[in-house]
Amino acid sequence: MITFYDETGKGYGAQVELKTKNAVNGERSISGTIVSNKQVLSRLDRGWSFTFDGELYKIIYAKPKDEGKNISLSFDAVHQFFYDFEHSNCYKEFNGSNRFEVYIEEIFKNSGYRYVIEAEAKAIRKENFGNASRLKMFKEIIKAAGLEFSVTGKVVRIVKKVGTDLSTVVRKNFNMNELTIEKNIGNFITYKKGLGAWKDENNHD
């Protein structure tokens, strides 16, 4: 049983099958299938959250599945850090060469997260770098420095690179154009009750 929280903080328990994924560069994502609780099945939306192993995750994608008499809902979720940093901007703009620490300090300023740098990095030259999401800037400067990071709670550890680039899951799910719920889940539930059907399977508006 997992408790999902809507954006007002109200909780809803549901039976869920989970698959977790931890990869290089801090990725902590979870995929799952919800099989019970009509309130969750019909209302789950981007930004809902749940806790797993003491860490908070945010829903970024959901898709209902017709299983005959029943409906299940598959979803993807990412650690709160990725969600928060994608939805928060850093308005500072950099031009020229700066120490790695200067970039990191500005990216994390007033973010609610703190960082620990456990590796050395050379100065990095950037032009017109800034005025973007914290996540975009953070990923770019980490890549430029040749480092990696891991996330636990509200703490981000920046370490020497030992793995490879971000996984497909993170690259896909943090394209802002793809951060959407695939279908209108409420309408899907209505359809299953026999009250209507999609006119266009690819257009559920």
Where are these regions (language model features)?
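Juxtamembrane "anchor/assembly" segments of surface/extracellular structural proteins
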Residues: 1-43, 80-82
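Envelope-exposed proteins and targeting segments
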Residues: 28, 55, 71-73, 154, ...
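Amphipathic, non-transmembrane alpha-helical segments in extracytoplasmic/periplasmic proteins
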Residues: 32, 77, 90-115, 128-153, ...
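Surface-exposed cap/loop segments at beta↔alpha junctions
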Residues: 35-115
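Short, charged/polar, Gly/Pro-enriched secondary-structure boundary elements
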Residues: 80-88, 163-172
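Surface-exposed aromatic
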Residues: 119-127
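Acidic/histidine-enriched alpha-helical segments
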Residues: 154-163
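Acidic, small/polar-enriched beta strand-loop surface segments
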Residues: 166-205
